[in-house]
Structures are given as structure tokens and as C-alpha cells.
């Protein structure tokens, strides 16, 4: 795990400083896994980590951040994947790309978990369409309540890295 942590710091996927998050909240660090996903060797390591953790024969993730992660992991595991889209106002209006059977178990992958709301949205979309979702995986858990929210909704969160494990981290 130390190798991946070092890679995330090296490529600038984890930065320390003064940042304003999407929520408007200030933070002393910023995590952007999309930055890491553009580096083939780092993406390969992330996919390898997920491949050792995933227990279902199909995975899913929310566009945009999770897409390179689910594609790389699906290729490594030779399993199909589902992309969960954000709101659609054109085309077929479908929120899901990919197929699965009602009652099929699907694991969800996310890049970064903070509050857990993004993962929960993906999980709820999948469940509303008949999937069984019990587990979610992320590259980095910011440890800001996301795991608790997911647990309350029947989802076990399995992070590759918890932010408190990262060298240089301080709240």
C-alpha cells in the first residue's frame, strides 16, 4: 500500500495546502484521483488493488471519476462493468450504461469518498433497477462520515487508503 500512497503524492493526486472543496468547506488537503488515473502505472496499481478486493462478478461506478477505475479493474479481472450516469436530459435518458440481471450482485467503485453521498446515489440507482449492492470500494476514504452513511444504508466501504494513513496528513 505504501507504494500506491507514494505514487498518489508523486503525481499530485494528494496535495497539502489550503483548499476549498465542492461543498464550500475548507480543507488542508485535496484528493484528485482523476490526476492519478491519467498515469498508466498508477492506474494499473489501483486496478490491481481493487482486483484483490472485489467479490462480485460485475462492478459499477459513477461517471466521471470512477470510469477509468472501473474500466481498468474490469479489464484486469475480465469482468463486465456498469457506468452510472448523472442526470440525463437527452437521448435515452437512461442513467445506466451496461447490462445486468435483476437480483445480480454488483460492487461499486468510487475514486474518493468524503460524505458518501455520491456512492449512495450510484447504489440507489443500481438498486432501483434491480441490482443487489452490498459493498463499495474507493481509492481514498477522507474519513469524513462517508463510511458511516454507507453502513446505515447496508453498504460496507473498503478503501485502499484512508487519508489518516498518508504521510504528511494532519487535520
From Swiss-Prot:
This is Orotate phosphoribosyltransferase. Keywords: Glycosyltransferase, Magnesium, Pyrimidine biosynthesis, Transferase. GO terms for biological process: 'de novo' UMP biosynthetic process; pyrimidine nucleobase biosynthetic process. Its EC number is 2.4.2.10. It catalyses: orotidine 5'-phosphate + diphosphate = orotate + 5-phospho-alpha-D-ribose 1-diphosphate. Homodimer. One of its GO terms (molecular function) is magnesium ion binding. Its cofactor is Mg(2+). Orotate binds at residues 114, 142. 5-phospho-alpha-D-ribose 1-diphosphate binds at residues 85-86, 88, 90, 110-118. It comes from the Archaea. Pathway: Pyrimidine metabolism; UMP biosynthesis via de novo pathway; UMP from orotate: step 1/2. Pfam families: Pribosyltran. Catalyzes the transfer of a ribosyl phosphate group from 5-phosphoribose 1-diphosphate to orotate, leading to the formation of orotidine monophosphate (OMP). The lineage of its organism: Archaea, Methanobacteriati, Thermoplasmatota, Thermoplasmata, Thermoplasmatales. Belongs to the purine/pyrimidine phosphoribosyltransferase family. PyrE subfamily.
